[in-house]
């Protein structure tokens, strides 16, 4: 899905922030 692609790009750019990003996506 689009959200999965966004998360992958975020992981590539800022791997440290992925944990918070996933929590935010999961909350939504």
From Swiss-Prot:
Any GO BP: oxidative phosphorylation
Location(s) in or outside the cell: Mitochondrion inner membrane
Keyword Membrane: yes
Coiled coil feature spans: none
Chief site of localization: mitochondrion
Pathway named in the protein's UniProt entry: Energy metabolism; oxidative phosphorylation
Membrane topology (UniProt): Peripheral membrane protein
Superkingdom, natural source: Eukaryota
Subunit structure: Component of the cytochrome c oxidase (complex IV, CIV), a multisubunit enzyme composed of a catalytic core of 3 subunits and several supernumerary subunits. The complex exists as a monomer or a dimer and forms supercomplexes (SCs) in the inner mitochondrial membrane with ubiquinol-cytochrome c oxidoreductase (cytochrome b-c1 complex, complex III, CIII).
The protein, known as: Cytochrome c oxidase subunit 5B, mitochondrial
Lineage per the UniProt record: Eukaryota, Viridiplantae, Streptophyta, Embryophyta, Tracheophyta
């Amino acid at each position: 899905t689009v959200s999965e692609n966004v998360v992958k790009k975020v992981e590539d750019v800022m791997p440290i922030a992925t944990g918070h990003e996933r929590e935010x996506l999961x909350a939504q």
